[in-house]
Curated annotation (Swiss-Prot):
Originating species: Rice dwarf virus (isolate Akita)
Protein's name in the database: Outer capsid protein P3
Annotated Pfam families: RDV-p3
Summary of the function given for this chain in its UniProt record: Capsid protein which self-assembles to form the inner icosahedral capsid with a T=2 symmetry, and consisting of 60 P3 dimers.
Stated family: Belongs to the phytoreovirus inner capsid protein P3 family.
Gene Ontology terms: cellular component: host cell cytoplasm; viral outer capsid
């Protein structure tokens, strides 16, 4: 599309530099007739300079198998006994969850116990995991040649896999023959074999010679659990949706070129001759929801800025001095005489003509991004015949959307004032004043501050005999009747400026078409439809009479009106015509004769709109609901058109340097679509509108993190929804309006697939909650602990107990209930208080520590058989710690414990919180590794040993031992079965081409159809 992905360093990375279309000049030649003379326009354009046609939102990198993050830890112990010597201690493998990537997803370290908060946190984490894990493709497994019996095999080199070296783990086995057998079986298990199928499905219609085949891959059985490999396996899907073979890129670039261009031969040869295993970033061909740009002032402003950069007009003009000298002879200027006609000669402004032409061009490319502010629009401006004539011609060159409704109303009223002052009879004026149709001519303030269309009111109240005014107004409104002129096209409540858009405010401009029915320039419609692009086109600036001759009907219409206004006589002469009629008439006649020179502007605009016609910022639909303050404004002086009339040289070869961006310019549109898609994803996961649960600041933070991952740049949601570009303050109504708008265009498939992948990862991770150290409840007891010194099992002691020895005497429903019990205070005596929660705790039966450690056969046995407990239904996380007990007993271990007072402090710290954080409960487990020592004395029952194990006793807040998800294997084959997963890897890594530039060249001299009306899309 049009945003670069993140580049990479080193040969181990997939290159994510995107395919761009480089600088290329072409000269499509349009040949057509103007006034029976041959005319050629040459457009020199740079096709999509640095315009990106592909993107990799989640750039891939390569890792070796040894770099895969491990989800499980392995502890090896030899189980003995503190009561007797065990001649053949059982070698046991303890597999437990490691603090790793799933902790981040499950919110182990921080955040809230509030379920919606966890859900939103996990959605956010998933997208960072796409980058951190799913985008890392396992591309290398170390292997070596070995034998199984007499059969040669390729076995995985286990000694390069760190703590997953299964040969090293096998060496812990008690007997040498067991070690040898286990290591021999490792070579059988962990092998390189033929791949059953191709793991990467690109889905492109490729020639057989460049299609991926299974014999290019091998499958490796490796000492990793399939859960540990699962996230990395998703890299294959990310590869196939973001990359493709160069021939796919060639077909895409060839199809998007207009029929007068083709790809450079060297580029074509490079792309079409690419061999198997070569990849390039995949072109993005799906459509964006282009109308979203009108929902955000930032997006609209960025698009407007891009448009202004792409307008380049080259007008061929005469020397100012030559024009002034020629016109000086017409008006008979002497050195000591100044009149209105001669005074205008000093106003010849070359730069002003260029400014007007650029303003006209941007108004034609998109009517929604800017508006003009007419300077010099005084009440009596039409009395200045140069100003009035230029303003009338300017109206013929611009769509009504180029000016605000207020300015167009002011022009109508200034014209009405001129007609009443100079062309109306005294009787007509008196009658209209008496009927309150108009104000008295000398009521300047009322005329200037008037908010109604006086011209329409006059038109509607003229008598049949008042033909002069009737004809002038009818001509101005392009033949529309008074009733038609008053017709409301867009009601005030549908405009951002609260004014009715009437036909009277549109008819004087361009063709006289209503503002909501501006004609599109459809020359490239077929080309765009062939590319599945929307029929968005610039506004049509002129019609074609036939034989590709540009029509000057708009200019002829206005010159007829100007002639009637100034050259057919006045009822009351304007002051500028007194004693200057001859020179004024001479200059104005020359002016009207020269108006066809404005064809030079038509030509330049047509060339520019053609060159820019496929850009996303083009539009011919006026959107009245866009606030005025969102748009760019530009001051324009109609009198600058004076030099355009006299100085522009039409029928000349015009060099136009417009730059078509094709699909560039859609960055903000894509970001807005992603913002909406992520918001909808959060809504689906939460089951309700996120803003109903969280502050918008929290929601925006999550959206920004996710979208930033997908577009590889930091974004700020608030900046897209402000009152205007100048205010910079967030507008909640704009945001709400954005959410209310129906989704008109789904996300490009690339992003839809990535978001679907993220959803799959989310569901996959959610299914693994059983291995995560989070529990839905915990228990409060007076005392706890577990000791089994005489056991030959793997657990010899613990700071917690098994759930079956707990006797629940009270249940606390949730955090609010616990908080309420804590806040129910009562006086104990004159100096102290207690609370209901403490009373509940104090009522529990107490068990002495001696019952946990000094007991028959070294095992904890309680007098009453069970321990009184309070069950608290609050989510908690447990912090698991292993201590390997080898029988030294020299220094008591440091065992973390959580006491009832700690829980009270937790409640006091968060009593005003609506969403409490997770309570962390430590669990320490002593592993039986007593089989590592042969000392008899260490196994004697003694007070010292009892004192040592008393370190495990005393916790009052606990999570039962059986909640901890550990796997205990006494057979090495069971451990091997648990740690056996498969990865399929390409023997030769993909060759990813970096930064290929697609250069277009012209196909000779190819005529381009000028007729902007002749290729209209079907209705």
């Amino acid at each position: 599309m049009d945003s670069t992905g993140r580049a990479y360093d080193g040969a181990s990375e997939f290159k994510s530099v995107l395919v761009t279309e480089g600088t290329s000049h072409y000269t499509p030649v349009e040949v057509y007739n103007i006034l029976d003379e041959l005319k050629t326009i040459k457009i020199t354009s740079t096709i999509a300079e640095q315009s990106v046609v592909s993107r990799t939102p989640i750039p891939l990198s390569k890792i070796g198998l040894q770099d895969v993050k491990k989800l499980f830890d392995i502890n090896v112990i030899k189980c003995g006994s503190s009561l007797r010597i065990v001649d053949e201690p059982q070698v046991t493998f303890i597999v437990s969850y490691a603090k790793d990537i799933y902790d981040k997803f499950m919110c182990i370290e921080h955040d809230s116990a509030y379920e919606p908060s966890l859900t939103m946190h996990r959605v956010r984490v998933i997208y960072s995991m796409l980058n951190d894990y799913c985008a890392k493709m396992i591309s290398e497994v170390p292997y070596e040649s070995s034998f199984v019996g007499e059969l040669p095999v390729k076995s995985v080199t286990l000694n390069k896999l760190g703590d997953r070296n299964m040969d090293a783990l096998a060496e812990h086995l008690l007997f040498e023959h067991d070690v040898v057998n286990a290591q021999r079986e490792n070579r059988i298990f962990y092998q390189r074999k033929s791949a059953p199928a191709v793991p990467v499905i690109f889905g492109d219609d490729l020639e057989p010679a460049v299609r991926e085949r299974a014999n290019l891959y091998h499958r490796y059985s490796v000492p990793y659990h399939q859960i540990e490999l699962a996230l990395h396996a998703l890299a294959n899907d990310l590869l196939s949706i973001q990359y493709c073979h160069p021939t796919v890129v060639y077909n895409y670039l060839s199809s998007r070129a207009p029929n007068f261009l083709r790809l450079d031969d060297q580029v074509s040869l490079k792309l079409t001759s690419a061999g198997i295993g070569t990849l390039m970033p995949r072109p993005v061909v799906q459509l964006l929801d282009y109308d979203l740009v009108y929902m955000s002032p930032l997006a609209l402003n960025n698009l407007a800025s891009r448009l202004l950069r792409k307008i380049s007009l080259h007008l061929v003009m005469q020397m100012v001095t030559a024009v002034q000298q020629d016109l000086g002879e017409v008006v008979s200027v002497s050195s000591n005489v100044t009149n209105p006609a001669s005074a205008c000669l000093v106003r010849m402004n070359v730069q002003g003509v260029q400014t007007l032409a650029v303003f006209i061009a941007q108004s034609m490319l998109n009517p929604n991004i800017s508006y003009g502010m007419i300077s010099g629009l005084t009440l009596d401006c039409f009395s200045n015949f140069i100003y009035g004539a230029c303003l009338m011609l300017f109206q013929a060159l611009i769509p009504p959307s180029a000016l605000t409704a207020r300015q167009r109303l002011d022009i109508n009223n200034r014209f009405a004032y001129f007609l009443i002052k100079c062309h109306a009879t005294q009787a007509t004026t008196a009658r209209l004043v008496a009927n309150q149709v108009i104000y008295p001519v000398d009521a300047i303030d009322q005329w200037q501050s008037n908010g109604r269309d006086v011209l329409v009111a006059i038109y509607n109240n003229l008598l049949p005999g008042e033909l002069v005014l009737t004809n002038l107004i009818q001509t101005y409104f392009r033949g529309n009747t008074a009733q038609q002129a008053a017709e409301i096209l867009i009601p005030a409540d549908q405009t951002s400026y609260g004014a009715n858009e009437t036909r009277a405010l549109s008819a004087p401009y361009l063709f006289g078409a209503p503002i909501n029915m501006l004609a599109p320039d459809a020359r490239l419609s077929t080309y765009k439809r062939d590319l599945a692009l929307p029929d968005r086109s610039p506004i049509l600036i002129t019609t074609v009479e036939g034989q590709n001759s540009i029509s000057i009907e708009n200019l002829r219409h206005k010159t007829g009106l100007i002639r009637a206004m100034y050259l057919n006589g006045f009822v009351t002469q304007p002051p500028a015509w007194i004693r200057n009629a001859n020179s004024n008439t001479a200059l104005l006649s020359r002016f009207l004769d020269a108006t066809p020179n404005l064809l030079g502007i038509y030509e330049a605009i047509l060339a520019n709109t053609y060159a820019n016609a496929v850009n996303v910022y083009c539009d011919s639909v006026y959107r009245a609901d866009i606030p005025i303050e969102w748009k760019l404004h530009q001051s324009v002086d109609p009198q600058d058109l004076l030099f355009g009339v006299f100085g522009i040289v039409p029928q000349y070869q015009i060099l136009n340097e417009a730059v078509p961006d094709f699909f560039a310019g859609g960055e903000d549109i894509l970001i807005l679509q992603l913002i909406r898609a992520v918001y909808d994803t959060l809504s689906n996961k939460l089951g309700r509108n996120p803003a109903d649960i969280f502050h918008l600041e929290e929601v925006f933070k999550v959206i920004e993190e996710i979208v930033s991952v997908l577009v590889q740049q930091k974004i700020d949601v608030r900046k897209y929804f402000t009152e205007s570009m100048r205010s910079g303050s967030f507008s909640k109504p704009r945001w709400d309006n954005f959410l209310r708008r129906p989704v008109a265009q789904r996300l490009p498939n690339l992003y839809s697939v990535i978001m679907t992948q993220a959803d799959h990862v989310y569901n996959y991770m959610t299914q693994l909650t059983h291995i995560i150290p989070i529990t839905d409840c915990f228990y409060i007891v007076k005392n706890s602990g577990f000791v089994d010194r005489g056991s030959t099992g793997p657990v010899i002691a613990s700071s917690s107990v098994y759930e079956n020895v707990l006797k629940v005497v009270h249940t606390i429903a949730d955090f609010d209930a616990a908080n309420a019990l804590r806040l129910q205070r009562r006086r104990v005596d004159n100096t102290s208080y207690t609370d209901s929660l403490s009373d509940m705790f104090n009522g529990l039966r107490s068990i002495s520590s001696s019952e946990f450690v000094r007991s028959v056969n070294g095992r904890s046995v309680f007098t009453e058989g069970r321990i009184d407990a309070i069950k608290v239904n609050m989510r908690a996380k447990f912090d698991l710690q292993f201590i390997t007990e080898e029988g030294g007993y020299s220094k008591p271990p440091n065992v973390k414990k959580l006491m009832f007072s700690d829980f009270l402090s937790f409640l006091d710290s968060h009593k005003s919180d609506y969403r409490p954080p997770l309570l962390t409960v430590p669990i320490t487990i002593g592993l039986n590794n007593l089989g590592e020592t042969n000392s008899n004395t260490l196994r004697m029952r003694s007070e010292a040993i009892d004192e040592y194990f008393s370190s495990y006793v005393g916790a009052q807040i606990l999570v039962p031992i059986n909640v901890v998800d550990t796997r205990v294997y006494t057979e090495f084959s069971e451990l091997r079965n648990f740690f056996t997963g498969d990865v399929v890897i390409r023997d030769d890594p993909f060759d990813v081409w970096d930064g290929v530039k697609a250069t277009y060249i012209p196909i000779g001299v190819h005529g381009v159809r000028l007729d902007p009306n002749g290729d209209q899309p079907p209705l």
